[in-house]
Amino acid sequence: MDFGLQPPEITSGEMYLGPGAGPMLAAAVAWDGLAAELQSMAASYASIVEGMASESWLGPSSAGMAAAAAPYVTWMSGTSAQAKAAADQARAAVVAYETAFAAVVPPPQIAANRSQLISLVATNIFGQNTAAIAATEAEYGEMWAQDTMAMFGYASSSATASRLTPFTAPPQTTNPSGLAGQAAATGQATALASGTNAVTTALSSAAAQFPFDIIPTLLQGLATLSTQYTQLMGQLINAIFGPTGATTYQNLFVTAANVTKFSTWANDAMSAPNLGMTEFKVFWQPPPAPEIPKSSLGAGLGLRSGLSAGLAHAASAGLGQANLVGDLSVPPSWASATPAVRLVANTLPATSLAAAPATQIPANLLGQMALGSMTGGALGAAAPAIYTGSGARARANGGTPSAEPVKLEAVIAQLQKQPDAVRHWNVDKADLDGLLDRLSKQPGIHAVHVSNGDKPKVALPDTQLGSH
């Protein structure tokens, strides 16, 4: 609009006669309220969705709900900001209007100028008012220019203030095909209900046509047939076993049934004692048995019936840690000084095992180098010893005593020349007796290694060392 073509009376009149800044202020307040409401709604919406997704509602459906609600929360926050901007622009328009209203010439001044001009023109008979008329017209022109400039400034400011950012529609947070799917499901359910009603109607019709009157007759016939069968079986048993056969047969089975009833009562009566005995067996632990004192290994490796001073403690051994005499592995006690060899066979050359204690050989197996005699076979029938896991025991095998003593040095020298002649056997306590029985029938020199738990034990074969 070209405000330069419009006289100041109209321009000023429109500014003074218009609604003023009231509507723009009301619009600014409304935009402010909308912005605050949208912001509050967005915060509440986000809080509710977050609380449901993290506490009361978990799983894939909860994640889908949160993902669908997030764009709507974003839209509300953005729209709230736009509403706040619109309120600010409305207030800017109010400021522009107030500025333009103050800049335009008030209509009373314009009316006074026009009245003065009319008066001067009416009294200008001789031209004496020509200067006054020109001054009045000049003043009017200034008013026109002032109103024109004020309106152009107001138009520019109001155009900027009224240029708002376009609002967008809220995003779609639901499935558009949900209504169609719901309608289809409703139709399917209706059809299924119709089919069910049809089936129910058909069954009701068939039930109405069924002849229920014949059921009592059928039941009565079955009862009669059962009675006739019982009578027939009774007559047959009486014909085979005599006139009281059926009664005896019936009493027999009644007695058997009563016996089973008594067994049930007995089971019920014994359930409590059985429970107590079961609990006693499960939780009762026997008191620890006293340990049998055992003498040391060196003090009791002789015969249990007289050569030993008592039960020997379990012997322990280490693999690959024995002393060596040349290539021969020997017990650790062989390294100590020993007395001269005195053979048991020389002491009692013609006696048996019962006379072995009379030789006064110490209980220690290594005392007086009896082991040397046993190694050479000179002990004969005295007492070749074997060793079990709990101690030492011996039994004698018959044989002929050696004709002459055998020196220990000669036996050791012979074993050094033939280190491979000694056969080693590994066995546990349970299989020791069986192994010794088998080795007693095999010639050669055998070394039996007995294992008991983590500590292996060594036992000599159940024969004379000189022959097996």
Swiss-Prot record:
User: SUPFAM superfamilies in the record, alphabetically?
Assistant: PE/PPE dimer-like
- Which spans are transmembrane here? none
Cystine bridges: none
Residue span of region Disordered = 447-468
Q: Which GO terms describe its biological process?
A: response to host immune response
Per its UniProt entry, which superkingdom is the organism in? Bacteria
Which Pfam family, an example, fits this chain?
PPE-SVP
Q: Which family does it belong to?
A: Belongs to the mycobacterial PPE family.
Protein name stated in the entry = Uncharacterized PPE family protein PPE33
* Source species of the chain: Mycobacterium tuberculosis (strain CDC 1551 / Oshkosh)
Q: Mind giving the lineage of the organism this protein is from?
A: Bacteria, Bacillati, Actinomycetota, Actinomycetes, Mycobacteriales
What would be the name of the gene that encodes this protein? PPE33
